């Protein structure tokens, strides 16, 4: 019987153990997509307690707690921090088989150093007190944890109207060497069908000093904000394409669509598709000219529980996987961006694992001459950010493309404790390659495969995003 979560956790062959301990383990972290609040990094935030750093805002944990019958007041409500932590501690033993069980104990181990102890009601007091004592120390501040975890770069997720003042503050601080750069997330300028669109256009017009009436005005406003983001070191965009649409339109049609929406009219699905296509093609060309990377996160079905959405708002654990087709529309969109050779470096993520092979083959259609891995099939995202999901994604990428050129893992997280997801990914990667070697499906060449592992863990992302590190 193998003990739970030793130093060789998941490393079930000798070759996997060599790959992980000698090549993967000590690689720095290049976290190119996350949802950390830049203000907390700028202020070097000190966490009040274990709830503050670990459960606050974590919809993964809230979903599990609700499934375990926990009352909403103990998830998102007015219960005390300790009551919420105790509710989580009571839920953890029921999460065996869920990635939360592994994540929880990896996060207790690093950075808190808690090993050989499982979170449950009987250990809750001890773990709460031990972690809170550590959180009072300087090296457990927001920046301290990032430094402990050997982070070199993080890309936050930022709206085009954001001032980026916190990024500027971080950049000016010569004592802090981790790159914290904004990522451009223009969903609110793109989702013309949303009730909030007109208010957002007013805000975008205000910050860009542009009166947005025609499509060209929107392009002008977005270009000004792209320049603002570029001045703060941005090299990455991110789009939530819950449904991939494609429909072409001329400028007069786009002007009419925008004018009708600004007048409060409801658009047809075809008109929405025309507008969204035009925005994505325009932005893709801007990214290509600037040398940016665009990310498309495809296939979320959001805010399913309308009653809870009205009470609690978005992003609190009521989203799931969509099953809308994507292949034809995505192909047309990428081909349109590529017509004038203005398809930027692109990472495609799917939420429905049914679409893994769709993306795995789609990227091969648009690879760039002289640019290894220009088009990327992104790491297992959200509901696929677990052992089976990561194995499936990497296996299919290897079979349909080049695993060796993969830019690897990202946390996509709101928590400063999520960096152990990189460790989890690295262990799974080494386990997978070790099994190939054990089965005689890959050569037992430690130099060849060790270098490949190092590249996937860090070097490929560093080179792909072309961000100069400190």
Swiss-Prot record:
Question: What catalytic activity does the UniProt entry give for this protein?
Answer: D-glucuronate = D-fructuronate; aldehydo-D-galacturonate = keto-D-tagaturonate
Please indicate which superkingdom the organism of origin belongs to: Bacteria
EC class of the enzyme, as a word: isomerase
Q: Does the keyword Nucleotide-binding apply?
A: no
**Keyword hit for Mitochondrion:** no
Q: Which GO terms describe its biological process?
A: D-galacturonate catabolic process; D-glucuronate catabolic process
Designated name of the protein: Uronate isomerase
Q: Which gene encodes it?
A: uxaC
